[in-house]
Amino acid sequence: MDGKFISFEGPDGAGKTSVIQQIQLELEDQLGTEKVMYTREPGGNKISEQIRQVLFDGQNTDMDGRTEALLFAAARRQHIVSEIIPGLKAGKVILCDRFVDSSIAYQGAGRGLGEKEIWQINQFAIDGLMPALTIYLDIESEIGLKRIAEHRSNQVNRLDEEKLEFHRTVRQSYLKLYQNYPERIELIDASQPLEKVIEDVKATIHDRFSDLF
């Protein structure tokens, strides 16, 4: 497969969406719109988007943690088969808003299901497919939640509404992943002004893929 698979991770409020949108625009200017694909998890195709609705429905407060983890993995599998593999075979640059690291951090650590256990569950889903590069946008939990309250209070989902300690645990798991997989994960300080964050992300992508930016 000739494409490039780049995932973006980070705690809630890190600004992933804004960063990815700008990166997508600039890569489309460079390569053409047909060579760049934005996608997200859970979601990215009809079936996975339907699973997303179940996962983020604010009324599903009694969802079991393992159910949540398995639904994320199911959505991921369909996403890989329907979107990511065809995109890579077509030689596209894939910008993915969250991938398996999110499950490890949110369900493995945040829900207390075990990071190794969630990784094992997802092996069946990903079948060895991992991003060539993961951009981790790091921000303190308090700052991230404050951003959510100020800028997208009308778009809060079931996971956003978790307590501060949950989000702190998620962040610590992300930092552990960054330490354990330095060959894949690059950390960007997301507390900086958005323009600086974007410049850092572009430089990081260029360092990994010299033909981009």
UniProtKB/Swiss-Prot annotation:
Transmembrane segments: none
MF-aspect GO terms: ATP binding; dTMP kinase activity
Catalysed reactions, as listed in the record: dTMP + ATP = dTDP + ADP
UniProt keyword list: ATP-binding, Kinase, Nucleotide biosynthesis, Nucleotide-binding, Transferase
Pfam families membership: Thymidylate_kin (PF02223)
CDD domains hit by this protein: TMPK (cd01672)
PROSITE patterns reported for this sequence: THYMIDYLATE_KINASE
SUPFAM superfamilies (UniProt xref): P-loop containing nucleoside triphosphate hydrolases
GO (cellular component) term, any one: cytosol
PANTHER family linked: THYMIDYLATE KINASE, UMP-CMP KINASE 2, MITOCHONDRIAL
Protein family according to the UniProt entry: Belongs to the thymidylate kinase family.
Role noted for this protein: Phosphorylation of dTMP to form dTDP in both de novo and salvage pathways of dTTP synthesis.
Protein name: Thymidylate kinase
Name of the coding gene: tmk
